């Protein structure tokens, strides 16, 4: 169960990084 939670957090982290790149660095 813990592994799936960590994997989900990693996926959210990747989405968050893409959002930051889009908003701040204008890389969409």
UniProtKB/Swiss-Prot annotation:
Name by which UniProt lists this protein: Palustrin-1b
Keyword Nucleotidyltransferase: no
Keyword set includes Transmembrane: no
GO CC terms of this entry: extracellular region
Family membership: Belongs to the frog skin active peptide (FSAP) family. Brevinin subfamily.
Keywords annotated in UniProt: Amphibian defense peptide, Antibiotic, Antimicrobial, Disulfide bond, Secreted
GO terms under biological process: defense response to Gram-negative bacterium
Compartments in which it is found: Secreted
């Amino acid at each position: 169960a813990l592994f799936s939670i960590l994997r989900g957090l990693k996926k959210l982290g990747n989405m968050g990084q893409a959002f930051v790149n889009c908003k701040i660095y204008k890389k969409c």
